[in-house]
Amino acid sequence: MKIKNKLLVLIAITIILGCEFKSDKKEPLNILWLVAEDLSPFYLNAYGDPRAATPNLDRLAREGVVYTNNFSVSGVCSPSRATLSTGLYPNSFGAQNMRTLFQQPAAREAGIIDYQAVPPDEVKMVSEIMRENGYYTTNNAKEDYQFFKSELAWDESSVFAHWRNRPDVNIPFFSIFNFGVCHESGMWNTKANFFDTGDEFPPDRSIKKWWEKYSNSHVPLLVPEDLDVQVPPYLPQNEIGKNAMKRMYTNVMRMDKGVGRILNQLEEDGLLEKTIIVWYSDHGGPLPRQKRLLYDSGLRVPLIIRYPNKDRAGERDDRLTSFVDFPPTLLSMVGIEPPNYMQGQAFEGSFKAEVPRKFIHGHADRFDESVDMIRAVRNKRFKYLKNFNPERPYYLPLAYRENMEVMQELLRMRDHGELDENQALWFRQSKEIEELFDTENDPHELNNIAKDPAYADVLAELREECESWMNQIDDKGFIREVDLIKKFYPNGKAQLTDKPNVEISDGKVSVSCETPGSRIGYRYTSEKAHYLGWKHYTGPVLERAGDTIEIITHRLGFKYAITSVFNGEQGKTFYPSNRHDN
């Protein structure tokens, strides 16, 4: 009897311990990135400017952490997104020019062709690493990575992509939603934007229905006509300058509405407290002397992170953070060790760096039809710029930017001798080789103190850091773009990923690829009706009667190859073409 009682006690203890073990097991967190475009932090209530009503961003700020020293690596989108997707500086692998794909007409007229930058062999898109670790990954919808995405990077990348499409609600997700309504083009294109405002998409996914609804619409100013705005000193201090500010604030409010729609969906699904929400902008503001430039108006970007259960709610974090830190931080947040090739450091999560970064770095190279090369280093107070083409003007004409009325007004004022001292600085015909700015006392970076003896030590420190950084990453800015293209496209065309090596035995399909850095994926044709993504190949795949297995091999920056297997026979291998092939 005693033995029986002891046995029952032992069983009970085992059950209790087992239950405790299960309860201690943490459920994987979801990650949601909400990405605005072309937006500086200076114009947001969370950062001190209440002119634009942003209730959803304000909520994130109240319930989360506001990061006050966050910086892009570039003042424009494509190089920034190259970094956000890889954890590499764009100028470390030839992705620094704006842009490599989808050239503007003026760039084509200047002889710039479409091409893909080619990252090193070992580099994966960070979303692919998330997929390999069990995450369902979606991107809605902007890509623009300076190379075509890995076909294994996303379960879905389209205007329809959503965590709600995952096949099992228990699968953790990493989802991105881009809000392009704040984009520079929104300063002159005032049509309502379906994708950015977050309206319900037609059930049949018909873009035509959306177009019919929105193509002739116009968004009026959402701020009062008499709103008292503060126009930056480098812009026209007249009605045109004020109207530009009002349009920018209006677009911020529209973006906030889209953010609110996604947050509501997250709450409807009961996922708010199971998700880390990261909201940021891809670079600085849309106005002249903001976007593309390496002043804080172009590099400094807002960042708000809401952690589950409002952890650290209301906190303001003044550590320096950079876009190159985002991929390692994303992985660190979900307990994945960042790969060694990443050039940034995690600022949160299990693999958070012990020492915060001391400097952030930035670059500016070709923008559309205009070529330059500038590098930037900044600590918490001082900004250093190195101009490698000092003989070139500060202002470089860009046909795209000149669609803006406020840009046209600046040029008119220049031509009529009406610019004041601050406005005229941007139109100087040559540059100083070195520039140094005290961003605390000179937030618009108008007063170059590089030659002031009082700041000689600061200048020397930042100059040394700039040189060290460029050497460390093997900066490709010194290579002419035409020579970069020859390196990436040695025969005048994109390099090809090797065809899949397929072996079929006993109903199993084994695949390999000889291209270094290539990835292998597969999918069954029967599954494409409800899922178009590719599964990672990790070992032999079973054939299914009457079904076709499609196989893909892809190395970033190369064209991918596709073949198929049906009834024990391999089909032809082909390389899909697109209008950007050369």
Regions found by a protein language model. Give the residues of each.
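Bacterial Sec-dependent signal peptides at the C-terminal "C-region" and cleavage site
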Residues: 17-27, 582
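Loop/turn elements at helix/coil->beta-strand transitions in domains of secreted/extracellular proteins
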Residues: 27-32, 63-68, 132-137, 169-174, ...
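Short, compositionally stereotyped local motifs that mark structural "simplifiers"
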Residues: 4, 450, 460-464, 471-582
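Polar, surface-exposed loop/tail segments
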Residues: 54, 84, 142, 147-151, ...
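A short aromatic-rich beta-strand->coil structural motif
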Residues: 31, 37, 330, 383-401, ...
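C-terminal cap/loop subdomain of S1 sulfatases and analogous C-terminal strand-loop tails that border
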Residues: 21-22, 327, 334-435, 457, ...
